[in-house]
Amino acid sequence: MCDEYLNLPIEITRTIGEIPFTEKIKEVYSKMKKKISYVYLIILFLFLIFYIGIFLAPYLYDKNRFLSLLIYGIYSQICHQMPERSYYIFNHKMGVCARCFGIYTGVLLGMLIYPFIRRLDNFKTPNKWYLILALTPMGIDGTTQLLGLRESFNELRFITGFIAGFVALFYILPVFLGVINKEKVFIEMKHTSHQKSK
């Protein structure tokens, strides 16, 4: 129901109570666009904090060992942090390995440019084959290394991770925003219909 209404031109003549349905669509859609922008900015802000933490862990190691180890501990839940597979900064390894750093860098860049190349209220995802193609290099690099067929190097780990993270963002973000805002549209429309029927 929601997809159908949001994709239709504003030419509907049906009404909800005394209010033209087109006007309600415009009202709900306007509120939805604002909420999408807020949610996007919140997600971007939280991810920036997460991304900065990758650099804070090595930076604080010689200044506040406890806090540094705490940050390393947090990132250890999502990354193996192997020294030989990590970049070093401030004379210490980063909070995540080179591949994970590439993934998160790709995600961050994707989030920053996303509003300039796609509307935030466009919840459609690109063709799945783009995602498959983007994940393939990382999959091949990681799998061949895991099987002992070859040893990768940090630059390749970063590049393959970056490609995967950048492209994956264009699938994850619209789905996430779509789920949140479609629920809001249903609630708004149902509430208005109920109020006008009294």
Task: Please place each PLM-identified region on the residue numbering.
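Interfacial helix-loop-helix junctions of multi-pass membrane proteins
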Residues: 82-98, 139-164
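Short, highly charged, low-complexity non-transmembrane loops/tails of multi-pass membrane proteins
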Residues: 181-198
